Amino acid sequence: MVVVSVSLGEKLLEEIDALRDELGFSGRSDVIRVAARMLIDEKRNLHELNGEINAVLFLIHPRRVEDLVTKIKHDYEDIIGTQLHSHLKDGNCLELFIIEGESMRVRELAERFLACGKMKHIKLVTF
């Protein structure tokens, strides 16, 4: 197995340690390996979608990037049916998009938010 070094913020490291203890992992590396596998599986499943789909996209982001969210959103108004926006504690915002459209276009929207690197949490649920 290859050893890699990763820089993590203190809060994230505390959360990883809590997960390790709560779920009984033997170490931090196990937690990170499982998380990486889950992300890879989620990405693979997203790329297997085809045809017209319905989806809900959840985002949590800092308020300071609202303009970026709006800019990306405007490029996908053809598939976004509804958007809900709510201010959360700690200067964050929650966005909820209800989407209907071609799977490739839905995937592209989710990937744009992922690629910008400014989102704290992204979750796409398809059906």
From Swiss-Prot:
Ni(2+) binds at H74, H85, H87, C93. Belongs to the transcriptional regulatory CopG/NikR family. Binds 1 nickel ion per subunit. It comes from the Archaea. The keyword Transcription applies. Its cofactor is Ni(2+). Transmembrane segments: none annotated. Keywords: DNA-binding, Metal-binding, Nickel, Transcription, Transcription regulation. Pfam families: NikR_C, RHH_1. It comes from Methanothermobacter thermautotrophicus (strain ATCC 29096 / DSM 1053 / JCM 10044 / NBRC 100330 / Delta H) (Methanobacterium thermoautotrophicum). Transcriptional regulator. GO terms for molecular function: DNA binding; DNA-binding transcription factor activity; nickel cation binding. One of its GO terms (biological process) is response to nickel cation. SUPFAM superfamilies: ACT-like, Ribbon-helix-helix. InterPro entries: Acetolactate_synth/TF_NikR_C, ACT-like_dom_sf, Arc_rbn_hlx_hlx, CopG, CopG/NikR_regulator, Ni_resp_reg_NikR, Ribbon_hlx_hlx, TF_NikR_Ni-bd_C. This is Putative nickel-responsive regulator 1.
